[in-house]
Swiss-Prot record:
EC assignment: 2.5.1.145
Localization (cell): Cell membrane
UniProt lineage: Bacteria, Bacillati, Bacillota, Bacilli, Lactobacillales
Positions of transmembrane segments: 20-40, 54-74, 88-108, 175-195, 235-255
Protein's name according to its UniProt entry: Phosphatidylglycerol--prolipoprotein diacylglyceryl transferase
Topology in the lipid bilayer: Multi-pass membrane protein
GO molecular function: phosphatidylglycerol-prolipoprotein diacylglyceryl transferase activity
Predominant location: membrane
InterPro entries with a match to the protein in the record: Lgt (IPR001640)
Originating gene: lgt
Amino acid sequence: MNNLFPFLALDKIALQLGPLAIHWYAIFIVGGAALAVWLACKEAPKRNIKVDDIIDFVLFAFPLGIVGARLYYVIFQWSYYSQHPSQIIAIWDGGGAIYGSLIAGAIVLFVFSYYRMIHPLDLLDITIPGVFLAQAMGRWGNFVNQEAYGKIVSNLDWLPPFIRNQMFIEGHYRMPTFLFESIGTLSGFILVMVFRHRIKGLKRGDIFSSYLVWYGAVRFIVEGMRTDSLMLGPARVSQWLSVLLVILGIILFVYRRIKKN
């Protein structure tokens, strides 16, 4: 219990409406997605993309992104879920992987772009600022669920009490790696929003490539601090994927500059 700020004492459930429990995790995920859609709808006309196309894309991408995030997590935690199959669908308790959501979202985006005859890089550039913001918000869902934390530390006196108390896990204070990633992705969002219309010579796909490099670097660093990483043998899966993102981002950025129009 937080004695200084009792109203900030955290529970996974934000609101109980009879048998319906509304979890903080869901609020942060849905809230981040809603802001991402709003941002994309504001930008779409500048790329000659219909707002209806953005809405239709989200109606496919959001639920499948949640499925992808959960499926990715379950696959790499199969030793547990094979023994507790009823927990596979318990997404309200947390246990989703951003990379799974990104993979599912990317598949939906390319298929959707093909059928709607929209250049995929245009759709990516439009949606990336919102993705940054949604990821920054989503990490606070992990915070409430006491996920995405780091190694044991002696104290967290530099943090506000409500964060410090929530980072007291299994009898020890834990490094708030969720916070580091949230700040990193929020910084990426701010940079993109400030500079995307101010830098001359930006090419189609540059915002997307900047996301790949920025988020890949942020996630690689933060993942190295975590103690609850998804593993494949001795390897941290997310760090390998982060390296891949950075490489792909650099390749795309260079390719767009050497490609003849």
